[in-house]
Amino acid sequence: MGKNLLEQLRQFTVVVADTGDIQAIETFTPRDSTTNPSLITAAAQMPQYQEIVDSTLLKAKDEAGENASIKDIVRLAFDRLAVAFGLKILQIIPGRVSTEVDARLSYDTEATIAKARYLIGEYAKAGIDKKRILIKIASTWEGIKAAEVLEQEGIHCNLTLLFGLHQAIACAEAKVTLISPFVGRILDWYKKSTGKEYDSHEDPGVQSVTTIYNYYKRFGYKTEVMGASFRNIGEIIELAGCDLLTISPQLLDQLRNTEGDLPRKLDPATVPQDIEKIVMDKATFDKMHAEDPMASEKLAEGIAGFTKALEVLEHLLEERLKVLDGQEHIKHGAEEIFHAYDLDGDGFITREEWAGTDVVFDALDRDHDGKITAAEMSAGLGAAFRLASVG
């Protein structure tokens, strides 16, 4: 019996689990893992993680003091919750976990640096070496400059929401540890813009990551490339050989259950030599960003989506804290999330409205029709996500 695609992929690419579901991580045994507000929101609705949420909230309330507002408590609890899930994940995986800086700080270099130092400090209190943590930051110019400072302090960074070569070059010149170009979201933009369907080998997201990978290898940059946000296993197959790929449990399951040859597509030995080097400064970055409508739109949309996911999670934590305090709980979390994301009130959440993490959208979209209904949501953040995560 031949090897499945997942086994073959692991021969030349580090596989990272794009999930906050600890049981899914145990199932697929990735080296690294990643979390963010929408993943934590989904996991926090699942009964098996309620104890983590409750204990984190109560501890934050205790430490915030009697005069703290509920919003102050919840903000403290969110950072602690991100670290709590990260600590659980680090008990399972041998490598690193990515923990995200508040997306609302994406255009504030100093605030991003301060938040990153705080998160690393929280992990240090639990005895975790900072080498096992990647601080996830949006790839704005300000975020990249924050990462440059943090890397000089030995705090490793994962620059996310990366859609253009200009962002990738700026990250490499800042000597960041890792970047996460978003394959599927690039494809989404081009499909919507052109009305075309793309085969995997001509997928604009695949081509973007290939260009970035070749540029890095051609000029000897040490920054690792981790392809993210996949729509199908065809994209993953075309990027076999990329340094790392972060893959949802659903697609990991498909790879594990598919046999056939998986040739290496990205390889330092076959990188073209006729690539022009670009010196990146802020003026060049801003010019290239303005000239790339896809990167401009998707970066802004991604920050807005991650911000909304954070606000929804904070609201759910507020509601949960009221329950723990014995106050009346007015609405179920899934209902709250549905109304928060159904921006036009038509009774459906599209991928554009969701704008948060793709893995959660895909898990909730149980019939895979590209939209989430209220019924799917209520089935939802526990049952549907669990079903898709563990398979």
Curated annotation (Swiss-Prot):
Region span, Transaldolase: 1-329
GO molecular function: calcium ion binding; transaldolase activity
Active site: K136
Annotated Ca(2+) 1 binding sites: D342, D344, D346, E353
Keywords, ordered alphabetically: Calcium, Cytoplasm, Metal-binding, Pentose shunt, Repeat, Schiff base, Transferase
Presence of keyword Metal-binding: yes
EC number(s) stated in the UniProt entry for this protein: 2.2.1.2
UniProt cross-references to InterPro entries, sorted A to Z: Aldolase_TIM, EF-hand-dom_pair, EF_Hand_1_Ca_BS, EF_hand_dom, TAL/FSA, Transaldolase_1, Transaldolase_AS
Positions annotated to bind Ca(2+) 2: D365, D367, D369, K371, E376
Cross-referenced PANTHER family: TRANSALDOLASE
Name of the featured protein: Transaldolase
UniProt organism field: Synechocystis sp. (strain ATCC 27184 / PCC 6803 / Kazusa)
